[in-house]
């Protein structure tokens, strides 16, 4: 499974690190604060760290998957959502990096599950239910006295809106967001519009780049985009 994940990460996942770095509004990088929500093994953060040449302590990584261990970063086995409570987390046991979420969109898509099991040659395993602790981004930042976030990456397989709703305060002080927006093909346009309107109108973000994740839509009823948002700067 590790080899399959490495291939998927290398050839199917987009790397936006260069455009993110180019749009950082800071002269030096040593005091950057980077949040990686839905980090899985931490490759997004590790890639940024290597390019920015900064300390591991600049990073805060979160994932609800209890099987992960990321010793080289500040890693928290915690789900980020809109409330502090116990929630259901659905772990994809046949390919944990894809579809594991508080949301059931991927779990419930029969065609996605069948075709991805074909790709992984793993027909016996499925999604398993786990009770996990969740908290809000605002609560986390308050508890750690974090006043601003330079880079916020969110990849949570359909549960992204709840994270934004639990970040009402800190979003005013976030510079760049890399956000995966995922939903069914029938409902995607509505969700995409709602999230973009929220970030543009309430928090003064603009879309810097968007790219459809084509591999997700093949043989499934799902659709997703990776979107880079940056704050509108008044010169």
Segments predicted by a language model, with ranges:
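Phosphate/nucleotide-binding beta-alpha loop and adjacent structural elements of enzyme active sites
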Residues: 1-235
């Amino acid at each position: 499974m590790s080899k399959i994940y490495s291939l998927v990460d290398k050839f199917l996942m987009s790397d936006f690190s260069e455009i993110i770095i180019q749009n950082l509004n800071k002269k030096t990088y040593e005091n950057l604060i980077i949040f990686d929500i839905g980090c899985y093994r931490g490759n997004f953060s590790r890639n940024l760290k290597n390019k920015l040449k900064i300390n591991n302590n600049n990073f805060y990584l979160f994932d609800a998957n209890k099987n992960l261990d990321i010793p080289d970063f500040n890693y928290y086995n915690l789900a980020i959502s809109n409330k502090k409570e116990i929630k259901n987390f659905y772990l994809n046991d046949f390919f944990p990096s894809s579809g594991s979420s508080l949301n059931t969109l991927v779990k419930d898509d029969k065609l996605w599950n069948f075709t991805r099991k074909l790709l992984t040659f793993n027909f016996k395993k499925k999604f398993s239910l786990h009770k996990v602790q969740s908290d809000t981004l605002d609560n986390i930042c308050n508890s750690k006295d974090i006043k601003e976030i330079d880079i916020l990456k969110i990849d949570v397989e359909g549960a992204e809106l709840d994270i934004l709703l639990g970040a009402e305060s800190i979003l005013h002080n976030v510079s760049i967001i890399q956000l995966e927006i995922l939903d069914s093909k029938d409902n995607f346009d509505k969700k995409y519009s709602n999230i973009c309107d929220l970030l543009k109108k309430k928090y003064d973000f603009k879309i810097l780049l968007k790219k459809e994740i084509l591999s997700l839509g093949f043989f499934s009823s799902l659709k997703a985009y990776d979107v880079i948002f940056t704050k509108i700067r008044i010169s």
